Amino acid sequence: MSKDEYLITDTPFKALTVFAMPMIIGSFFQQIYNMADSVIVGQFVGSSALAAVGACAALTNVFICVALGAGVGAGVLVSRYFGAREYGKMKTIVSTSLISFLLLSIVLGVFGFFFANSLMSGLQTPADILDDAVLYLRVYFVGFPFLFMYNILSTMFTSIGESKIPLGLLIFSSILNILMDLWMVAGLGLGVFGAAIATLIAQGISAVFSFLIFLSRMRQYKSSFSRFDRQELYSMLRIAVPSVLQQSTVSIGMMIVQAVVNPFGTQALAGYAATMRVENVFSLIFVSIGNAVSPYVSQNLGAKKIDRIKKGYHVALVLDLCFAAIAFVTIEALHTQISSLFLGKDGTAFAYQVSGDYMRWLGYFFIFMGIKMATDGVLRGLGIMRPFLVANIVNLAIRLSVALICAPRFGIAFVWLAIPVGWLANFLISYVALRRSWPTNKMASIS
């Protein structure tokens, strides 16, 4: 029995906790990595530069979600074949996905580079920060293939039950990004451009290290495989496409929401951008738990251990409840201090009000997001993608409709008031679908 097979041998609580904790810790470092640009730019350059970096966040998240969604399609099949010990098919999926999705990343990177100005103008980015935002975005797209490779390989590692290696790489990358940010922004005075270059270098080095380590790991599984298999690509896309649509649809929705925020001015955008970073910190905890559930479910489905799936789902819900409580207490006690990390002395009272109101509202309702992510994780692991996609579209529709209709008339607060309603609706739809499609031993065969 391989040591990587603990997801199908240890108790569900131990298996999921041991597997999820490095991913949760990694989520903090992921956000430290992401926030480094914002914090350092906000402190050493000013709130306008922070707004420029923040203005890119919704758009860059769309492309990140494409990478993550692509990884999900490959990861579910890798987990299932790994659980069934069909290592040749597993390696075929890995090779096919890397070839296909890296080509896609190059196409998207070229598109983003040449259309950066049009994209940011279309989001109604304030004129005083448009040039900096476009500059940051173009450098970001140059490094997009590295970002794509790193995210797909991280998914591959977790799919075979290895969550510590991505954590180590993420810690290294985060520290490198912070040091490069400090040198280029605070030391060399390169401003927004320096922050973007620092991120590009950190992403590139992390992607190369990830590839070399994963290649070494795959060589341990002695079996023949195809470098590219069209049929396996189709199987992968059946799972990846709904996941890409779900994740990118939500991010596109956030772009539209940002377009609603932008007319309120640079200070409103700075406050909104600050809290979006904080939201991402806590959101990634729940996302990590959901992402841990998916390979756990898929491996146990492949190993025909159906009884362990429900137990694992319950463990995930308990973890979500604990972290939602931590998020609530942290935000209630420290929301002003957290906002000041991003806004600094340059932030106005209005920016602090936007940031604080948004942050506290999220703190009350993060539990809804947690149970939604755990339920979505089970659906992904089982390959039940249609209700998963529908639930997330309903979530987005609620959030967008309230923001678009109410915020321009009644104030910026309506941008975030509907968020927990969308999370709860998403959970209820996903839960009903899961109850109707709960796996039996007949499902435990690989299609």
For each predicted feature, which ranges?
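Short alpha-helical transmembrane segments in multi-pass integral membrane proteins
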Residues: M1-A20, V78-G143, G187-V241, V297-Y364, ...
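N-terminal transmembrane alpha-helices
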Residues: L7-F44, A58-G73, L77, L102-G109, ...
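Interfacial/gating helices of multi-pass transporter permease domains
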Residues: V18, V41-N61, A127-D132, V192-F193, ...
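Transmembrane helical elements of multi-pass membrane transporters/channels
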Residues: V18-D37, V139, S173, A202-S206, ...
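Helix-terminus/linker motif at the lipid-water interface of multi-pass membrane proteins
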Residues: F28, I32-L50, M120-A127, W183-L190, ...
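Small-residue-rich hydrophobic transmembrane alpha-helices
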Residues: L50-V110, L147-P166, G271-H335, M369-G383, ...
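Hydrophobic transmembrane alpha-helices of multi-pass small-molecule transporters
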Residues: V62-C65, N177-D181, S206-F211, V281-L284, ...
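Short runs within selected transmembrane alpha-helices of multi-pass transporters and secretion channels
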Residues: G71, Y140-T158, P166-S174, A195-V208, ...
